[in-house]
Curated annotation (Swiss-Prot):
Reactions this protein catalyses: N-acetyl-(2S,6S)-2,6-diaminopimelate + H2O = (2S,6S)-2,6-diaminopimelate + acetate
Catalytic-site annotation from UniProt: D70, E129
Pathway participation: Amino-acid biosynthesis; L-lysine biosynthesis via DAP pathway; LL-2,6-diaminopimelate from (S)-tetrahydrodipicolinate (acetylase route): step 3/3
Keywords, in A-Z order: Amino-acid biosynthesis, Diaminopimelate biosynthesis, Hydrolase, Lysine biosynthesis
Highest rank taxon of the organism: Bacteria
One Pfam family recorded for the sequence: Peptidase_M20
Stored HAMAP family: DapEL
Function per UniProt: Catalyzes the conversion of N-acetyl-diaminopimelate to diaminopimelate and acetate.
Protein name as annotated: N-acetyldiaminopimelate deacetylase
GO-annotated molecular function: N-acetyldiaminopimelate deacetylase activity
Organism the protein comes from: Streptococcus thermophilus (strain ATCC BAA-250 / LMG 18311)
Annotated family: Belongs to the peptidase M20A family. N-acetyldiaminopimelate deacetylase subfamily.
GO biological process: diaminopimelate biosynthetic process; lysine biosynthetic process via diaminopimelate
InterPro entries (alphabetical): AcetylDAP_deacetylase, Amidohydrolase, Bact_exopeptidase_dim_dom, Peptidase_M20, Peptidase_M20_dimer
Amino acid sequence: MTLDLIKIRRDLHQIPEIGLEEFKTQAYLLERIAEMTEGKDFVEQRTWRTGILVFLHGSAPEKTIGWRTDIDGLPIVEETGLDFKSIHEGRMHACGHDIHMTTALGLLDQMLQVQPKNNMLFLFQPAEENEAGGMLMYEDGAFGDWLPDEFYGLHVRPDFKVGDIATNTNTLFAGTCEVLVTFKGKGGHAAFPHEANDALVAASYFITQVQTIVSRNVDPIQGGVVTFGSFHAGTTNNVIAETAEVYGTIRTLTQEMSLLIQKRVRQIAEGVAASFGMEVDIMLKQGGYLPVENNPALAKELMAFFDASPAVNLIDCLPAMTGEDFGYLLSKVPGVMFWLGIDTPYALHHPKMSPNEEALAFAVSEIGKFLKYKAED
């Protein structure tokens, strides 16, 4: 069948939902998938919570090729002014997952035209933004015997043009780790500081000391980010704060570096707390947001394939410090992630982010050729 990619994308754009709450999105996808797979006896399907797995049995399979897309939206008030803007208040597809899903449906439609030689898995994964849905599915056994031998996926990129595909042979996205540190002192009157134990001051010392992690503990060639964007302490001007809470993020290009920085954050927090004679709670939550590390051999193959296509402008790009939970699945299955240019002036997660829809036909055409090649390889 011939899919109306623009209509599908606009339909999906109007119903963004937060991770593990993608009920309308799942229902819409299941309807389209049912239409496409009718009469195709080589297709099986499973659901996992709000996720969907579509498996194409190959005619003479030697391996399983996987394509993964994410399906969730963000808690953002849309400001695009589009006729097809979000109908869910306070929710928006500001990270391009509507483009991702539409592309995946288009690719699935192409692969259904003729039974492939190799098996193929199309994964519509929930909760990329908030709960590391890929990790949840893997740990819950959702893949079963459908786990791919190779996994591929994309992410849209606003500052690249339509026709651009960008990746590299190592790390594409950073791993991320949430940090929440709470210092617990003793409150009191501002006039009697000697009778209190000021958690605000302790947290301030902590914030300044963690700045030395990147400058003195991290190899300058490897790099790393430690940022605290939230600091909450106290209630008014003349009361010494009993507790202080700081909330931040760690981003690194290797898991080894992430573990080093996490260790140093914990050591500094405990050291500062001890020096002030107070307690400290430390929460380090990485979950499934590991670095997105491409398999070098598969990345070279993919890059050579796209480089040979006149329609593709292949870019060998540097890593980005953005996070993506596909990193977890790529830690279990070799594969490749790449950027797809969508040519819009607004960044990902911006309330006015609006992709150039010409990217859809390009993506389905060019990536479809690659998947057909892999399906017959």
